[in-house]
């Protein structure tokens, strides 16, 4: 099993997932991730300081406001937001973080489509947080056709690997 697959398996084994970056303005990849986690039986928490609810579920301004500590955090927001959220993960003792990147785990290919921040990745690693720096849970959690194809293409192109 590849390192990424092992990390994904560990992340998806968690039960309570905070999803940072949901939006009420339009359908987004983050919204799709939230709904995919929820439909697969996870306890999910929407996080965005600009909105109060998402699809009838409460939306929280930050991780500290959640009713319980999440087991894992999925971030699909700007790298600047990712830096702040990872600081909260450190404070709360969250041990699993996934930073989204549309282009696999090589965000240099399309810096505008990534939540990956080198500072956030480093902060995770320094604090014993398992971090997946790129890709998308929708490629692994009962993927639809498009996400299955992205996973296959990024895998063939070497864009699904993780460096320690």
Label each PLM-derived region with a short phrase:
Residues 23-28, 34-55:
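NAD(P)-binding Rossmann-fold cofactor-contacting core
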Residues 18-20:
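Conserved beta-strand elements of the Class I
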């Amino acid at each position: 099993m590849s390192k990424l697959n092992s990390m994904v398996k560990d992340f998806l084994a968690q039960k309570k997932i905070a999803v940072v970056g949901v939006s009420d303005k339009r359908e987004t990849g983050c919204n799709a991730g939230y709904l995919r986690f929820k439909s697969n039986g996870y306890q999910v928490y929407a996080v965005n300081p600009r909105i109060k609810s998402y699809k009838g579920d409460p939306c929280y301004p930050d991780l500290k406001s959640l009713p319980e500590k999440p087991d894992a955090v999925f971030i699909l927001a700007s790298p600047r937001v990712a830096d702040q959220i990872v600081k909260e993960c450190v404070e709360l003792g969250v041990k699993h973080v996934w930073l989204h990147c549309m282009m696999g785990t090589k965000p240099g290919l399309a810096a505008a489509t990534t939540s990956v921040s080198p500072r956030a990745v480093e902060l995770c690693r320094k604090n014993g947080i398992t971090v997946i720096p790129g890709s998308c849970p929708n490629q692994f959690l009962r993927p639809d056709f498009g996400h299955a194809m992205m996973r296959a293409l990024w895998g063939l192109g070497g864009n699904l690997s993780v460096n320690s």
